[in-house]
A protein has these predicted regions:
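Aromatic-rich carbohydrate-recognition surfaces in CAZymes
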Residues: 52-59, 107-128
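Extended ligand-binding clefts on enzyme/binding-domain cores
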Residues: 21-23, 49-53, 92, 115, ...
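Positively charged n-region of N-terminal signal peptides that target proteins for export
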Residues: 1-4
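Solenoid-repeat scaffolds in large eukaryotic assemblies
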Residues: 59, 71-72, 133-140, 263-264, ...
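Low-complexity, Ser/Thr/Pro/Gly-enriched N-terminal "stalk/linker" regions
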Residues: 19-54, 64-107, 156-161, 195-232, ...
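Bacterial N-terminal signal peptides
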Residues: 6-15
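C-terminal functional modules
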Residues: 281-366
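Short glycine/serine- and small hydrophobic-enriched flexible loop segments
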Residues: 60-65, 119-129, 185-189, 248-252, ...
Length: 366
């Protein structure tokens, strides 16, 4: 049945399958409030108006999902010119850009952020495939090779993993990792290319489950060859604003993915917290399971895919609908675009990691 939804996120209140017009008002809101005419994604937090490679990478993905080729091209052009020294084939993007001490605008930290590089490579490869654009395909392939050379390390006793960046995460036989930097869908897509990707994809369930012994993902975790998983000294065992993406990625896994059932079951305790308290926690100890605070609405959106078909889905949809999108909450808006966009049926990932966007005039909300 077709429901007419007058408010921006009123669709979220519909607990029955409903036909939703595939115009994406949340994406329009994001473009209006966060993307400059030049193609820069601006995070207004604390008045700094910074740009991160993360923001650029996510916006590229959302532009692809919405078949927005003009915005995709602007985002890519700005990313390459300002973050990659004008050449994405030769340099990984710098992760942080903003106002420098001398008042000029430019790169603030030249280190890379591998999760952003993953999403940029993925979006380029899928844009090339879906739009039949050979330039995007070639650029995505070259970027993926550079990621393999500069950001992948083979950890003794574990195997090849993605380091959070090209520098600063390895020392004295110990490596710091971020589980949320490893969307299984992306590794599945990359597995068809030459490199360590197939082995990394096979290793991922072990990495995610062992680093979250109680079913709560940590933001950061260390691997030490002779001791295994260890708490990251300067960050602790807390899972919060980074770790929320682990549940998001797992919820969006294809039903045909052989690892989906065990991963969803392992990380079910986060949804149990919603059932017990009526809200998601802001932070959780990955070792003790102790919870702190009340998570923002972006967390609710991020858990929508994982809650599919469960009573929690209705609660989460209402929380997202009641809050809507803010004009000054970049990260929460990103989580909402990912989670609510998936919940609205605007895109899916196939078992091989390929993107399945709904570019028809209407899409199916589930």
């Amino acid at each position: 049945m077709k429901n007419v939804c007058g408010a921006l996120l009123l669709w979220a209140l519909c607990s029955l399958p409903a036909q939703a017009v595939c115009h994406w008002p949340e994406w329009d809101h994001f473009r209006q409030h966060y993307i400059s005419e030049e193609g820069r994604v601006i995070d207004p937090a604390e008045g700094r108006r910074i740009t991160t490679s993360e923001g650029q990478s996510y916006a590229l993905f959302f532009a692809l999902v919405n078949d927005d080729r003009e915005t995709f091209a602007r985002l890519l052009d700005w990313t390459e010119r300002q973050l990659a020294r004008g050449d994405l084939t030769g340099f990984l993007p710098s992760w942080l850009w903003g106002r420098q001490q001398d008042g000029n605008w430019g790169v603030l930290d030249a280190n890379s952020a591998s999760d952003s590089d993953f999403w940029i490579a993925y979006s380029l490869l899928e844009a090339g495939r879906l739009w039949d654009n050979h330039s995007y395909s070639a650029l995505g392939t070259l970027l993926l090779r550079r990621i393999a050379r500069e950001e992948v390390a083979t950890l003794p006793g574990l195997g090849p993993v993605l380091q959070p960046g090209a520098k600063g995460y390895e020392g004295e036989g110990r490596w710091t990792l971020n589980p949320s930097y490893l969307p299984p869908q992306l590794l599945a897509r990359f597995a068809s290319f030459q490199g360590p990707w197939g082995e990394m994809r096979a290793l991922l369930p072990k990495l995610l489950q062992e680093s979250a012994p109680r079913g709560f993902a940590p933001d950061w975790v260390d691997w030490q060859a002779d001791k295994g998983w260890q708490v990251t000294a300067d960050k602790g065992d807390t899972g919060g604003y980074d770790a929320i993406r682990v549940y998001l990625w797992l919820g969006m896994l294809s039903e045909e993915d052989p690892a989906r059932a065990s991963l969803v079951a392992h990380f079910a305790p986060m949804l149990a917290q919603l059932t017990e308290s009526g809200h998601l926690p802001e932070r959780v100890s990955s070792l003790s399971g102790q919870v702190q605070g009340k998570g923002p609405s972006g967390f609710a959106a991020a858990l929508l895919p994982l809650s599919r078909g469960l009573p929690a889905q209705v609660t989460l949809r209402k929380q997202v609908s009641d809050h809507g999108l803010d004009a000054d909450a970049y990260y929460g808006s990103v989580l909402t675009l990912f989670g609510a966009g998936w919940d609205q049926g605007r895109y899916r990932f196939a078992a091989d990691g390929t993107l399945q966007p709904d570019w028809s005039e209407s899409c199916q909300a589930e």
